Design a protein with these regions (language model features):
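C-terminal nucleotide
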Residues: 2-15, 20, 28, 36-88, ...
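Glycine/serine-rich anion-binding loops at beta->alpha junctions
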Residues: 7, 97-120, 271-286
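A short catalytic or substrate-binding loop motif that flags glycine-/basic-rich loops and adjacent residues
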Residues: 29-32, 279
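Glycine/charged-rich beta-loop-alpha catalytic/anionic-binding loops adjacent to active sites
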Residues: 62-63, 90-102
Length: 325
């Protein structure tokens, strides 16, 4: 049986979430938590889908005439997009696993879409990479998930760190994280509707009138400074900008007690920076720390978060890990 295993990274928004909705800039980076997809040849007349992470399985006919239901629909949409590009649809089994918690704002869904697209096209002998991989995976995400921003898919396909503004092509940021510094991601375990938080924050900003506008303008200045800090490897400045950005997100109503507690603990335990990442009201916080402080910090955070992981950022994008025949 021929088969391929491909993986793609998750993402963190380091700066600018929420403000990006009104056309301001954000910085996103790839993380060392990855989604892995194994695609195997089968005999039969089905595409079989299995996600141990989500605990779901389904099978769909090769003519793609019906959906897979729920979370698995994105794979059908990717196959439809590939068929339009001239790829054939052959019987195969798909097994999806992710190191990221689902719906925590870490881009798990886009990473699995990208890894699947790469694995399947590699199985057929014409692997898609770079912009082509991005285009097809994004099409699947778009049909399955409404209006994704494209940040998650871009990071999953290309890796690295990007400066992003809605409606523009993302610009790469050459981030330099010196030895001896690490990031941690802490998941509150609280699920929330991104749409609800986004609508609430927009309402708050509107209510504040000119003051609201100024918060957005300040957030954009923070992004500008953060690009310089990343490129020069100035971790002390980067950390302070993270705390500052969190404060702005608190001001517009995106945080909650669980996130603020994590950020406060990080500050008390000497972390260089911490903030919520993504939509807020739950999901994850990101923390920047010196390597020597990690154990104490992690121990303390684990009492308040469902999951705490030490991660690398600015990692490579989608890649084929195994190809067996």
């Amino acid at each position: 049986v021929g088969g391929v295993v491909a993986s793609a990274p998750g993402k963190l928004i380091l700066f600018g979430e929420h403000f990006v909705v009104k056309g301001y800039r954000a910085i996103a980076t790839s993380i060392s938590l990855r989604a892995r997809v194994r695609v195997e040849d089968t005999s039969g007349s089905w595409v079989e889908l299995h996600s141990p992470t989500l605990g779901v399985r389904s099978r769909i006919p090769l003519d793609l005439s019906r959906s897979a239901g729920g979370e698995l629909d994105v794979y059908v949409e990717i196959l439809r997009a590939l068929r339009k590009e001239g790829f054939s649809i052959v019987p195969h089994r798909v097994v999806v696993e992710s190191e990221m918690p689902v719906a925590a704002g870490l881009g798990s869904s886009a990473a699995t879409s990208v890894a699947y697209t790469l694995a399947y096209t590699t199985l057929l002998g014409s692997p898609l990479y770079g912009e082509n991989l991005l285009r097809v995976s994004f099409e699947g995400e778009r049909v399955a998930h409404g209006r994704p921003s494209g940040i998650d898919t871009t990071i999953a396909a290309l890796g690295g760190t990007i400066l992003y503004r809605r409606g523009e092509k993302p610009a790469p940021v050459s981030a330099r994280i010196p030895e001896g510094y690490v990031f941690l991601v802490a998941d509150t375990g609280l699920k929330r509707s991104t749409r609800d938080v986004v609508d609430y924050v927009l309402r708050v900003a509107e209510m504040m009138g000119e003051a609201g506008e100024q918060v957005y303008a300040v957030a954009d200045k923070v992004v500008e400074k953060a690009v310089k800090a990343l490129e020069s490897g100035d971790m002390e400045l980067l950390g302070n900008l993270m705390y500052f950005n969190h404060g702005l997100l608190v001001a517009v109503g995106a945080s909650n007690l669980a996130l603020d507690t994590i950020v406060d603990i990080a500050r008390m335990r000497g972390a260089l920076g911490a903030k919520l990442t993504g939509a807020g009201w739950g999901g994850c916080a990101v923390i920047l720390a010196r390597r020597g402080d990690v154990e104490v910090l992690r121990g303390e955070l684990e009492r308040h978060a469902r999951m705490v992981k030490v991660i690398n950022v600015n990692v490579p994008g989608a890649t084929v890990e195994k190809h067996f025949v």
